Amino acid sequence: MTDAALTTLRNHLLQALENHPGSETRRLFHGRGRCWPGLEQITVDWLSGIVLVMLFREPEAEHLAALYELLDELTRSPQWQHSGARGLLLQHRHREGSESEWLAGEPQTQWQITEHGLHYLLDLGSKQNSGLFLDMRLGRQWVREEVRGKRVLNLFAYTCGFSVAAIAGGAERVVNLDMARAALSRGRDNHRLNEHDLSRVEFLGHELFKSWGKVRKSGPYDLVIIDPPTFQKGSFALTQDYRKILRRLPELLTERGTVLACVNSPDIGPSFLIDSMAEEAPQLHFERRLDNPPEFADIDPNSDLKALVFRL
């Protein structure tokens, strides 16, 4: 982080607030895409009126002080007033517990956001991840447009963002599986926020590799979504375990089933999914890679989110 980089950040954020997304949710600045030299450690999100600034590496003391000054100036700017922003939260992702501090506005522990007209509840200031990964915005929209009348399996469901999009898109039924039951509980809350019929949604709080019987029982599925963490201690190691899922897909899918397979590790490119699918489930053919939101531009397109569509 340099003085020149901070000036770039200031100008970018003032412009972003001038053209704020209103009640919607968007990333305002994506330094981690490495398109902004000196700002690789910072991102800024607009969460339906809350500005979330995330630091992924500790800057030098003088630059950290300058960043605080910049953010204070931002909250007193005409652009801030114009945007109607309600608060600013700085999260130190590099520190133990992802320590957070409110620099403006009334502290909020929970906050409702909107994405493509759908509502989600976030945790602010208490957890490393707030509850919705914004880079998957277009993936959720694709699911919403794909699933009318279909049965969906959502693996590694987290807070059920895909499920909310699927039910909004007219899916017949969605089965969500995640070993984190608290995340699934939040998923229920997200469906309720959108006044969805919960009789069409199933929540399985189980470890996937011990639960194939339960997963098969609720199938077959027209769409299987696989969006695992890069590493989940004690339960999932991406490169070793992803293949185990892929080889099971043919027994889970309907005759013309579709798979949305995702990976979000900078060290793993799309060829990993394409080659692994060809080896483990050759019946499934690669169709396309979904676009990522333009605000998540990355200097290396193989480093950012990969969301690939396969069909029988």
Segments predicted by a language model, with ranges:
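C-terminal catalytic and target-recognition region of SAM-dependent MTase-like enzymes
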Residues: 258-312
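Non-catalytic substrate-recognition/targeting regions of SAM-dependent transferases
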Residues: 37-38, 43-45, 66-133, 141
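Conserved SAM-binding loop of SAM-dependent methyltransferases across substrates and taxa
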Residues: 159-171
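S-adenosyl-L-methionine
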Residues: 179-225
